[in-house]
Amino acid sequence: MPQTFAEKILAKKAGLKKTVPGQIVEITPDVALSHDNTAPIYGIFKRMGGQRVFDPGMHAIFIDHAAPAPTTAHAENHRIIREFVAEQGIEHFFDVGRGICHQVLVEEGLALPGEVVLGSDSHTPHAGVMGAFGAGIGRSEMASIWAVGQLWLRVPESMKIIVQGKLDPGVTSKDLALKIIGDLGADGALYMSVEWHGEAIQHLSLSQRATLPNMMAEMGAKNSFIPPDEKALEFLEGRAQRPFDVILPDPDAHYTQTHTYQAAEVEPMIACPHTVNNVKPLSAVAGTHIDQAFLGTCTNGRLEDLAAAAEVLTGHTVARGTRMIVIPASSQVYRQALQAGYLETFLNAGAVIESPGCGPCMGNHMGVPAVGEVSISTANRNFRGRMGTKESEVYLASPAVVAASAVAGAITHPKDL
């Protein structure tokens, strides 16, 4: 029986010949990811009677959501995490400044083809850029994995997205993701496995590809998968933490839904307040005043994203009365951007550069907006209150558009500067 990626990988992990959508399977993940919520998970783990975690080598723990600590309460949370990591002998621990969990997991060769990554973060599908099954789970579920090493999952139905052709210059995978979310809705892939196929996907760099599975959390997906090709395998040479086996869907597998897009028809898109699926062409909202521009996050804080923004900012300055905040997704990206001269470009333009981490994306620190202010961001969410106050507005866009908007003080296409 032909199998989709999700059906095939979950069958393998459960020791079965095949699975079908809706079937319940018990698996042991290859990677269990947690971040600042490790401290409350530890509390649940202890209440369960847990003493030692199952396989310390399986866990990857990050401090990234509120890092460095903006309050004493956050600092205490970080202390608990560090004590837990030392007590349990966790091998893969990434402290303040190392970067955002999803980005660093890929950089460190911990997100691998044919493996299962379960994380206590809704954007864990990001790992699908490397051909892994990445899925977000709850805190009690993660505590259970710590205790017994297993978790049950319902095999998801699968959606196939085919993107033909090639994106036009100036159009990015962020625009493609927003276009699809706008078309299919915030629940368009609810508890589904979203697979990406077509020549347009193959043309994309790994950095551009990563935005796609990351954004599928905003469509309700359980996981999202891009078939690993030579680009992915070359990236993993000398980087992969262990041997892996690529798992691909069968050519004649059955998909609950199939959607085909022509890449050349995609234009720069904007997600407008207050939902990610409130998507409009850039041309429809051009000229909208902004107070702040934010470049970063696990969605678009990689070197290629910073390069696109730096190109726009060269020879320009951030508009008077507008703030621009730049946060590289990891220390590796920060270092590479420094060497490439991008950070100097940002500084010359009047932007503020912060240490790697999530920053204001979820309203913790490093540039949360004031009441009544408008932000444009490269992040993945713009729910009311996402960046702090519920009395602000957040627009989502690609890195180049965010940079151009910072220069203009209003939502702007780079070509119009």
Enumerate the language-model features and the residues they cover.
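Fe-S-dependent hydro-lyases/dehydratases of central metabolism
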Residues: 1-417
